């Protein structure tokens, strides 16, 4: 909740550990790996690199992903998925076919596939989230992949997996039934009725093969699609009993409009998107007279600035490799705040992508660069545990062209009863004004500041480079003491602050 105060007043944040929203799903801190550009090849997989392990996986990339505490990784796409035959990526590498990959107009070598992905997930301690092809693929090919991954030996595709050196099932729990099938750009694009019927039948077969799995339905690719939200309504009504999540996607950027105040208020758009989808879920549940629940999976989200997206038929082309500035990091931080504020309906989220492609990690042969956006994700994934809290905020308003008057502070919070710790995450959107803020703690009152971090600067375009890799990075700060359940802190203009109290 929010109320307005005058600009010269001290902002107030009220937190009561008894005013909770929902349990925070660990799967909110997921990532996405697609066969696009250099995400897989030269990203996570680079056997020629001295920085790779014996399996060809980049050790520095995996260390960075472990640092960010990724809980799940979605694979193999993305638009790539809708033209992908999963059989191309299993078995002896010397027999795997080279293909013209149509989604990104690249050459796919298939040297990295399902089993290599499973090994990668184990090494970073993340749960695999597989996707099945609903473009050129069939409901049978979807069921076959589930059998390959999850069935015990004794049938065709489980035995095939065993012959490839993996006798034990991978036991993949989460399965996306297609990707962005509402988009005309998608290979094998279907209309809403065609997709819904195909997805329902695919999910039935997949769950018959492996009854414990959870399935993700393709929702709208973004909130500006002409079929939004009718696509979602039709797909949900048709498939409700067979699906566990509705996928939503969104990207944003400030490179075209160059409207920084509105860009720094992007959480308004993000939150509206979730609210519309939550209402659609409630409607579909009522319409189907069901006791079954379906939640949201925001399994593609990121700042995406303009850049090349066609590979001109080369291997591992440099596609969509754009740097991320301080203002981009503050937008990412707001996205994460929305995840906590909507934890009652949003249970899965996967940032696109984990390295090189529209990513806050970039590789080259001799190292790894972290952009500013790396830090809000890392801090929240490490601090936010337990339940999300319903923060009450009193702060000034800032004027924006797209969203009208917006609170200058964007806030989310968490409370973990097991460790008796509170996490607080604050964005100061102001381009010019620092904000003195009182954090008022109620309930199980914290007494100490265990961690305090800030990412701040005076230039919204400040960006890390290979020459200056720490130009925009989160730094530990000395926070004032908590006195009588209150912590007063100064929030610089253009800043992100993460606190862990205990």
Model-inferred region functions:
Residues 2-231, 236-245, 267-271, 275-308, ...:
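Non-catalytic accessory regions flanking glycosidase/transglycosidase catalytic cores in CAZymes
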Residues 249-265:
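Active-site His/acidic residue clusters
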């Amino acid at each position: 909740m929010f109320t307005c105060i005058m600009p010269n007043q001290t902002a107030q944040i009220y937190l009561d550990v008894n005013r909770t929203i929902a349990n925070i799903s660990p799967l909110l801190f997921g990532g996405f790996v697609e066969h696009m550009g250099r995400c897989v090849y030269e990203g996570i997989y680079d056997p020629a690199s001295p920085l790779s392990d014996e399996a060809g996986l980049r050790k520095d990339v995996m260390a960075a992903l472990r640092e960010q505490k990724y809980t799940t990784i979605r694979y193999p796409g993305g638009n790539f998925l809708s033209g992908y035959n999963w059989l191309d990526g299993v078995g002896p590498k010397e027999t795997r076919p080279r293909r013209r990959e149509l989604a990104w107009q690249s050459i796919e070598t298939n040297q990295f596939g399902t089993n290599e992905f499973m090994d990668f997930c184990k090494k970073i301690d993340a749960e695999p989230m597989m996707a099945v092809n609903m473009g050129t693929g069939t409901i049978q090919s979807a069921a076959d992949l589930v059998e390959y991954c999850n069935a015990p030996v004794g049938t065709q595709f489980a035995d095939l997996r065993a012959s490839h050196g993996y006798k034990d099932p991978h036991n993949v729990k989460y399965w996306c039934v297609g990707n962005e099938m509402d988009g005309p750009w998608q290979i094998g694009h279907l209309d809403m009725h065609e997709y819904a019927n195909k997805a329902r039948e695919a999910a039935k077969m997949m769950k018959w093969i492996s009854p414990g799995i959870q399935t993700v339905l393709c929702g709208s690719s973004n909130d500006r699609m002409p079929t939004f939200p009718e696509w979602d309504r039709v797909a949900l009504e048709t498939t409700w009993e067979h699906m566990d999540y509705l996928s939503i996607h969104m990207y944003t950027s400030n490179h075209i409009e160059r409207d920084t105040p509105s860009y720094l208020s992007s959480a308004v758009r993000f939150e509206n998107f979730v609210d519309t989808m939550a209402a659609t879920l409630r409607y579909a549940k009522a319409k189907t007279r069901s006791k079954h629940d379906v939640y949201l999976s925001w399994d593609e989200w990121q700042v995406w600035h303009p850049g090349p997206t066609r590979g001109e038929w080369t291997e591992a082309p440099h596609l969509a490799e754009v740097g991320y500035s301080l203002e981009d990091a503050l937008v990412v931080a707001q996205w994460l705040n929305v995840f906590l504020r909507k934890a009652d309906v949003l249970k899965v989220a996967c940032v696109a992508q984990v390295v090189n492609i529209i990513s806050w990690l970039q590789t080259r042969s001799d190292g790894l660069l972290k952009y500013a956006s790396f830090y809000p994700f890392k801090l929240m994934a490490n601090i936010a545990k337990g339940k999300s809290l319903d923060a009450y905020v009193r702060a000034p308003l800032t004027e924006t062209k797209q969203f009208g008057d917006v609170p200058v502070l964007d806030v989310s919070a968490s409370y973990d009863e097991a460790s008796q710790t509170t996490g607080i995450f604050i964005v100061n959107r102001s381009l010019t004004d620092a904000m003195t803020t009182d954090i008022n703690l109620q309930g199980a009152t914290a007494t100490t500041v265990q961690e305090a971090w800030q990412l701040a600067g005076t230039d919204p375009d400040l960006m890390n480079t290979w020459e200056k890799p720490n130009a925009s990075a989160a730094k530990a700060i000395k926070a004032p003491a908590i006195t009588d359940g209150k912590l007063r802190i100064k929030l610089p203009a253009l800043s992100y602050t993460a606190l862990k109290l205990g």
